[in-house]
A protein has these predicted regions:
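ALDH superfamily catalytic-core signature
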Residues: 160, 193-327, 390, 452, ...
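Conserved C-terminal structural/oligomerization subdomain of aldehyde/semialdehyde dehydrogenase
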Residues: 23-24, 220, 318-459
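Residues at or immediately preceding the N-termini of alpha-helices
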Residues: 6, 25, 43, 227, ...
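Rossmann-like NAD(P) dinucleotide-binding subdomain of oxidoreductase/dehydrogenase enzymes
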Residues: 93-229
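N-terminal Rossmann-like NAD(P)+-binding subdomain of aldehyde/semialdehyde dehydrogenases
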Residues: 1-101
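Structural signal for hydrophobic packing residues in well-ordered secondary-structure cores
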Residues: 17, 21, 36-39, 43, ...
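Short loop/edge segments at beta-strand edges and connector loops
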Residues: 84, 169, 190, 307-309
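Residue-level signal for inorganic ion chemistry
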Residues: 28, 73, 134, 165, ...
């Protein structure tokens, strides 16, 4: 039986990896430099593609896609030598005379599957980690962002031979064909349903995975919060990419004592950002397609809308919408919204708010607005979540110095900066023993003296 093109591609990458070329630190750095130059050279095309796919302005594209990718590249180039160094560790006395060290080695041929909401950044940032660690890589962008996919294919082709890095475009058929191959590592960003499929396929070959998923990320505002700042930063987090962000504040839990004062401030901040009519705002992103547009519109309960609620299917835009008096049984609380809707739930005690969050799947993010240090400490200690902010939203992921990832239902594994390097490499532990002295304690026959000596060494 003849091999399929995807099978041939995987085989070619295995052969290239076996050559040892990617193990050279200089080669890895050259690859990252080439990628950075290509991104800068294609910046205008990237801007145009993201405008076509999502209606992203050039400013938001640089802030959330191109700029973050370039920053990650710069960070990795500065620190790669340190990340890749052999690390010496202490050796226990029982192993005398010997030395111990760990080395990081690449997995081999990796697969990176990216979503449509940040189609450039969420493909390129994992690629940076894969290349820095010395892997070959097959990239699989989302078919829902075709213009961006096309530009990324041009960038990859300009930088790398396909036996080193290749981009496979297509839809579900191509995704399934890729998952039928044996990879050495799979990195997936997307929804829980497809994440399960990826993990199921990976389990057939015991392939390690990173799953960057999502969930309903709460925003908690207590009575001590700076309400004006909280309103502005919550509006930013919700409106960014029109709410199509895996770490967007999904719903608001607010102290009943300050709810009536806070909501008008939130409405005012939204209007400052997108104007009186967001449907005609040039800075405001649109829904990715009709299917997603209709799904989000279907979550709007007109009886509970206190702000917004209008939509334009022709432009795929939905107004920022606040829904008050929402209950846990409402449709908008049954799934991740992934759009510009904000359900509001008032609480009478922080215990009530924390119980509400903990009775659901672990969120990818949590945001707390509070000036109470004791409450801040309590929330961090009592709620499992991937990552988050105190007195801000979303910006915790905009750094290469902390890992980003989920926990439980919101994902497994993390990346960014050194975490990316570690994710795409295996830590090999080595003990080097001298042959000049060979302690007889461990060898048979065992005696009372050997037993006493072992108890001295191993305690």
């Amino acid at each position: 039986m003849n091999a399929t093109p995807i099978e041939q591609l995987v085989a070619a990458q295995r052969q290239f990896f076996a050559s040892g070329r990617t193990l050279e630190l200089a080669f890895r750095k050259q690859s990252l430099v080439a990628l950075k130059k290509a991104i800068l050279a294609h910046e205008a095309e990237i801007n145009a593609a993201l405008m076509a796919d999502l209606g992203k302005s050039a400013t938001e594209t640089y802030m959330c896609e191109t700029g973050m990718t370039l920053s990650e590249l710069s960070y990795m180039l500065r620190h790669l030598g340190r990340f890749a160094k052999k690390r010496r560790v202490l050796t226990p006395l029982a192993q005398f005379p010997s030395s111990s060290f760990t080395v990081r080695e690449p997995y081999g041929v990796t697969l990176i599957m990216a979503p449509w909401n940040y189609p450039f950044m969420l493909l390129m940032e994992p690629l940076i980690g894969a290349l820095a660690a010395g892997n070959c890589c097959i990239l699989n962008p989302s078919a829902y962002a075709p213009a961006t996919s096309k530009v990324m294919a041009q960038i990859v082709a300009a930088c790398f031979p396909p036996e080193y890095v290749a981009l496979v475009e297509g839809g579900r058929a191509e995704n399934q064909a890729l998952l039928h191959q044996r990879f050495d590592y799979i990195f997936f960003t997307g929804g829980v349903t497809v994440g399960r499929e990826v993990m199921r396929a990976a389990s057939e070959t015991l392939t390690p995975v990173t799953l960057e998923l999502g969930g309903k990320s709460p925003c908690i505002v207590d009575e001590t919060a700076n309400l004006r700042v909280a309103a502005r930063r919550l509006a930013f987090g919700k409106l960014l990419n029109c709410g199509q962000t895996c770490v967007a504040p999904d719903y608001l839990l607010i102290s009943r004592k300050v709810k009536d004062a806070f909501l008008p401030l939130l409405e005012r901040e939204i209007q400052r950002m997108v104007g009186e009519n967001a449907l005609v705002c040039d800075s405001y992103v649109h829904m990715v397609n009709e299917k997603h547009f209709r799904r989000v519109c279907g979550l709007i309960d007109p009886d509970k809308v206190i702000f917004g609620g209008q939509a334009d299917e022709r432009t795929l835009r939905i107004q920022p919408t606040i829904m008050d008096r929402v209950t846990a049984d409402d449709a908008v609380m049954q799934e991740e919204i992934f759009g510009p809707l904000l359900p509001v739930i008032a609480y009478d005690s922080i215990d009530e708010a924390l119980a509400f969050v903990n009775n659901r799947e672990h969120p990818l993010a949590l945001y707390l607005f509070s000036e109470d240090p004791a409450l801040q400490k309590r929330v961090l200690a009592s709620v499992p979540f991937g990552g988050g902010c105190i007195n801000d939203t979303i910006v915790h992921l905009a750094t290469s110095r902390m890992g980003f990832g989920g926990v439980g239902h919101s994902g497994m594994g993390s990346y960014h900066g050194k975490k990316s390097f570690d994710t795409f490499s295996h830590e090999k532990s080595v003990l080097k023993k001298s042959t000049r002295i060979d302690m007889p304690v461990r060898y048979m026959p065992y005696t009372p003296l050997k037993d006493r000596l072992l108890r001295v060494f191993l305690r």
